[in-house]
């Protein structure tokens, strides 16, 4: 068996996750403005921007089980390369779309071929020593968080200076770099999982001590993510309605980045507070707090 330095893999996977996270979030702040630039009226821009963003997530959810099966058969590294190269085309190609239909089509394909981050996570999880798995996977996850934080800020800045289409070329370059780094530096000595060792999904679910709690957490997370992600397609339009027309793209990107940055800064504090007062109470308070904040945003002037 080939000796693999998992720490080297972790560093490259972290940077790849950072580039991928930045690429995903780069386009969110100005998507409705780009939709308008493609000839869609301002009264329909929010709808088509939301469609362009959500169609990628929907197709990713539908096709991710297929890529998961192939990853179990051929390895995680090939799936990381496949995702990186495919998304280079689907995201970079957005710089050349002539109309809204091509935008929706490429966003759909982007979701179909996505999967860099989950395969990077699975690869590192399979290589890191068990006693270091928590810290290693936690470190790896910060790559996506850091990319998601900085992406909107960078995207808004570049869009103001060079135009929105230039941002898509930058995104394509980021994803291509992630694929190249994976090809050149990620090492994997993959051994397919024997069918008799694979645990059925039903058995995994029934082995959970409180399965109803898992379902409730899934539904709660779904509602929270649904609510939070619904802001992206309308944010730039809302900021413009508030009278901010100068540096609109940069301001929109800054707002998105600030939300992510505040989440990152408070995560550790909230975790400790949850251990002290109870996670259930903290979840209730956090959801009420979110309701108040969004109501205040709705009445901003």
Regions found by a protein language model. Give the residues of each.
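Pair of pore-lining "gating" transmembrane helices in MFS-fold secondary transporters
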Residues: 6-33, 37, 210-230
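Central cavity-lining transmembrane alpha-helices of secondary-active solute carriers
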Residues: 51-67, 257-269
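Paired small-residue
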Residues: 90, 101-109, 293
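Juxtamembrane intracellular "pre-TM" segments in multi-pass secondary transporters
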Residues: 1-7, 188-217
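Short amphipathic helix-loop junctions that connect adjacent transmembrane helices
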Residues: 30-46, 234-250
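Symmetry-related core transmembrane helices of the 12-TM Major Facilitator Superfamily/SLC fold
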Residues: 167-183
């Amino acid at each position: 068996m080939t000796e693999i330095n998992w720490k080297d893999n972790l560093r490259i996977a972290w940077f790849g996750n950072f580039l991928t996270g930045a690429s995903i979030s780069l386009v969110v702040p100005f998507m409705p403005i780009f939709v308008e630039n493609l000839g869609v009226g301002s009264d329909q821009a929010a709808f088509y921007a939301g469609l362009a963003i959500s169609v990628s997530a929907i197709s990713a959810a539908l096709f991710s089980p297929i890529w998961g099966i192939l990853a179990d058969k051929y390895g995680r590294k090939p799936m990381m390369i496949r995702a990186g190269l495919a998304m280079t085309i689907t995201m970079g190609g957005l710089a050349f779309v002539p109309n809204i239909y091509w935008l929706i089509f490429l966003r759909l394909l982007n979701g179909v071929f996505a999967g860099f981050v989950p395969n990077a996570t699975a690869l590192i999880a399979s290589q890191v020593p068990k006693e270091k798995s928590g810290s290693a996977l936690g470190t790896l996850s910060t790559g996506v968080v850091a990319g998601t934080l900085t992406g909107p800020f960078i995207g808004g800045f570049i869009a103001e200076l060079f135009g929105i289409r230039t941002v898509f070329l930058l995104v394509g370059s980021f994803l291509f770099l992630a694929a190249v780094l994976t090809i050149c530096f990620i090492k994997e000595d993959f051994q397919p999982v024997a069918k008799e060792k694979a645990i059925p999904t039903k058995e995994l679910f029934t082995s959970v001590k409180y399965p109803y709690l898992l379902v409730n957490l899934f539904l709660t997370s779904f509602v929270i993510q649904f609510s939070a992600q619904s802001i992206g397609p309308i944010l730039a339009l809302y900021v413009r309605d508030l009278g901010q027309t100068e540096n609109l793209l940069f301001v929109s990107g800054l707002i998105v980045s600030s939300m992510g940055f505040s989440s990152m800064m408070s995560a550790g504090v909230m975790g400790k507070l949850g251990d002290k007062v109870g996670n259930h109470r903290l979840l209730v308070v956090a959801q009420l707090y979110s309701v108040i904040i969004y109501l205040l945003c709705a009445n901003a002037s």
